[in-house]
Amino acid sequence: MTRFFQLVFVTLMLMLPAAAIAGPAEDANAAIDRWSAAFNTNDPETIAKNYCSDAILLGTVSPVISEGTQAIIKYFTPTKGTGNKNAIDERRTIIINDSAVVVTGFYTFTRMVEGKAMPGPSRFTMLVTKRGNEWCIAHHHSSPHVLPKN
């Protein structure tokens, strides 16, 4: 009977999907997906929770560097209650080590102006780090994605 249970156990273990075991790339991208969902709430405090406490943000529409939680909240305060949205269009991932991952790509911010949706293509680079058991954004650079005119 013991042999039977061993066989059942091994069979069940082999049936588990490999995707259930996430690595640094998956964890970092999940953190960025949480950031995007938080941005879509238009709540600065919710957005800021996705950043490390000592994070640096070079925001799309800011002439200054935002450093630390309070500065990041201040940066996102103008989005509060606006209905602005973010959608990640494309990304690439570079694993630095088991606790640091760089993700770069394109996203689109859609802001509401007089009830009309105005898309703003942008590009980003984020350094996502594991602090303790949590992944957070340590560095975030965002800028408009302006296509060259022919």
State where each predicted segment sits.
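Outer-membrane beta-barrel domain signature
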Residues: 113-115
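Short hydrophobic/aromatic-rich beta-strand segments that constitute the beta-sheet cores
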Residues: 57, 102-103, 137
